[in-house]
Every structure is written in structure tokens, then in C-alpha cells.
Amino acid sequence: MKELIKDPLNLIIIGVAGQGNVVTSQLVCDALVREGYLVTFGQSYPAQQRGGSVINYIRISKEIQCSPIIPEGRADVIVAMEPVEAIRMLAQFGNPDVITMVNPRPIQAIDITGSKAKYPGLNKVMEDIKDLSAKTWVINATEEAQELGNAIMANVILVGALVGCGLLPLERKSLEPVIEERFPRAFELNMAAFDRGVELAREQE
């Protein structure tokens, strides 16, 4: 069995509503529990966004049951399905050792869309993410999912990438039953998305 890179491991998964980040979190949690890990899951909703995004907190350990909310400045891994959301999480939960995985497809959340503020330049956002992270994995999950036939599978691609780069102590066989239960009529397609995520992560090693 693979080992945690840190115990407990504090993982944050964030995205704009509709990107499937809650499903991403559920797949990760279910697979970890099946492998015998103690997993605590929590959520919060940024007030300024009025439903624009949801923060998913996942705390993983072999030894202890953690509280559901990750303290500020204590994230070990941040997975952002949208670049500006990565910056927000790094500002609040980042530290010199934090690892970030980001899908570089920008989506304007409610607070940006509803105001006069423009979405910041993507190149600058990506540079800032790298500057604020000890290690950054850029996974073009939306683009790859579209090539597979459905952009919503970006969430499964990111799960595959987390496994592929070794940030989660899981293997393909850990996710197969979880993905089959969640997507029984699209199991093979979602496993293809998972496998593509693994490949994308390993290409950056």
C-alpha cells in the first residue's frame, strides 16, 4: 500500500459551482475510506460569492480523526478547478510547503461576474500560483475532458492526476469500484478520464 506524504494530510479541493468539485471530493473520500484511512470531510462557502464556489476540506490520516475544517495556513495540497480560486486558497491556507494542482481553464465566479472587476490576466494568475507554491502541477483537465467527450469529466481527470503524481496513497484499483458505483452507465469512459489524469501527471514528473 502507498503511504501518505504527510499524516495527517490536509487536502483542499475548490472550484466554481457546476465544475463537479464536490463529486471530486466524494470520489477521493470514498476511495480512501475503502483503503482503511480515517477521513474527515467538511465544506464552506465564501460569503462574498453567494454560491459561486464551495471549498471542500479533506483531512486524511492513518492514526487520528481530525476536525473537519483545515486551519488557515495549514493546507498540504490544494486542488483548484479554476485558477483564481487557487490564488484565493493559497492566500488563506498556503504555506512554504504547499503543493498546488490547478486546472488552468478560467471561469468567472458570481462575485466577479456581478461586479465591474475584470477577470485578471491568466498568465499572471498562473505565475502567482507557482510563486506561492512549493510545487505546482498544471493539469489541463477541462480541455482533456472535452476531447474525451464531456467537459464535466475534468473532475475525474483531476482525481487521476492526484493519484498519478503520488499526492494520494491510492491506485487505479482503489478508484475502480468507487467510479463504477458513481457512474455505472459511463464507467469505462470515466476510467478513461482517470487514466488520462494519471498520464498527465506523470508527464510532468
What label would you give each PLM region?
Residues 1-205:
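Active-site cofactor/cluster-binding pocket
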